[in-house]
Regions:
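Dinucleotide-binding Rossmann-like beta1-alpha1 core, especially the glycine-rich loop
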Residues: 1-44
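Flavin (primarily FAD) cofactor-binding/catalytic cores of flavoenzymes
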Residues: 74, 85-86, 150, 197
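A conserved short coil-to-beta-strand element within the FAD-binding core of flavoproteins
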Residues: 81-96
Length: 265
C-alpha cells in the first residue's frame, strides 16, 4: 500500500489512476483490485497517526535466485551445456572464445559488459553507470508491503514482508566498480531514518539482522544517476552480441531481439 498524509494531493491522484490503468492493461491477468481507504487511528497498523489514507494494490514478488536456478534446470532439460565457475580468458568479434570457435557469442554479463569489451580491445558503444542498491533484513513483521518516499524525497522505498521478517530497500548510489558491493553506513542510516519517518514505533540498528547489495548496469546519459536509462542496448560486432543494461523484467524482450538478430544474418 501507499500511505498518504493529505486527503487530496497530486501524488494521490497520480498513483490512484496509475494503478487503475495497470489493472486495465492487465485485463484478466490482474492480480486483484486496488482500493483507497481511510486508516483507522486505533488499528494495528504500523504507520504513524499522521497518515489518513492508503492506496492498496497487488503486485508480484520474484525470488530471482530461485528463478535463475529454475531457468538453468529448464536449459539442461533441453540438452544445453552449462559450465559454471568456468574461467574464460579471451574472446573476439569473430566468434572465438579462448581456443574454440562459435557461430555467435552473446555477452550477457550484467554490469561487466563494458569492462570485458575493453579487456578484449573491443570498442564499447555505450557507457555504463554502476548504481549500487542496498537492502536491509529487519527483525520486524508487517502484514503487507508499504511503498513510501525516502527522507530525500527523490525515490521510493519498499518495505516488504519477507519470510516472517521485513525486507527494506533500496538505495541508489553510484560506484566506480561492480565488484564486491556492500552496504555502507550512509545507506544504512538513510533506510532506517526513512522507515522511521512513517512508523508508529521506530526501529533501531539492533533490529537489523543482515544486509545485501547489488549493482545495476544503467546506460549512462548524464551526471544524474536518477535519470540514467533503465532501458537496454544491444551492440553487434560481427559474431559478438553484447547486452548493455536490462533487467529480469526485460529479459524476454532482450532474448526475442537477439534471436531476431541471429536469424536475420
Amino acid at each position: 500500500s501507499i500511505p498518504f498524509v493529505n486527503l487530496i494531493s497530486l501524488d494521490l491522484l497520480k498513483f490512484f489512476f496509475g494503478v487503475k490503468l495497470y489493472a486495465l492493461l492487465a485485463g484478466s491477468k490482474s492480480l486483484g483490485n486496488s482500493k483507497l481507504s481511510f486508516i483507522k487511528k486505533n488499528s494495528d497498523k504500523v504507520l504513524s497517526n499522521n497518515y489518513k489514507l492508503e492506496l492498496s494494490f497487488f503486485d508480484g514478488v520474484m525470488d530471482d535466485t530461485l528463478l535463475g536456478k529454475d531457468l538453468i534446470k529448464q536449459a539442461k532439460q533441453l540438452d544445453i551445456d552449462i559450465f559454471e565457475n568456468h574461467e574464460i580468458s579471451s574472446f573476439d568479434i569473430n566468434g572465438k572464445v579462448d581456443e574454440q570457435n562459435f557461430d555467435n557469442i552473446i555477452l550477457a554479463v550484467g554490469p561487466w559488459t563494458k569492462i570485458l569489451l575493453q579487456k578484449n580491445n573491443i570498442k564499447s558503444l555505450r557507457d555504463i553507470d554502476y548504481i549500487k542498491g542496498s537492502h536491509l533484513i529487519l527483525n520486524k513483521q508487517i502484514k503487507s508491503g508499504i511503498m513510501f518516499t525516502g527522507i530525500c524525497n527523490s525515490r521510493y522505498i519498499f518495505a516488504l514482508p519477507f519470510k516472517g521478517l521485513t525486507l527494506l530497500g533500496t538505495t541508489e548510489e553510484r560506484v566506480e566498480s561492480p565488484e564486491n558491493p556492500s552496504i555502507d553506513l550512509s545507506e544504512e542510516s538513510y533506510l532506517l531514518e526513512s522507515f522511521n519517518s512513517i512508523l508508529k514505533n521506530p526501529i533501531t540498528k539492533k533490529d537489523i539482522l543482515s544486509s545485501y547489495s547489488g549493482v545495476r548496469p544503467l546506460i549512462k546519459e548524464g551526471t544524474n544517476s536518477h535519470k540514467a536509462s533503465r532501458d537496454f542496448f544491444i551492440q553487434k560486432n560481427k559474431r559478438l552480441i553484447s547486452i548493455f543494461g536490462g533487467k529480469w523484467t526485460t529479459a524476454p524482450s532482450i532474448a526475442r531481439k537477439i534471436v531476431t538478430i541471429i536469424n536475420n544474418e
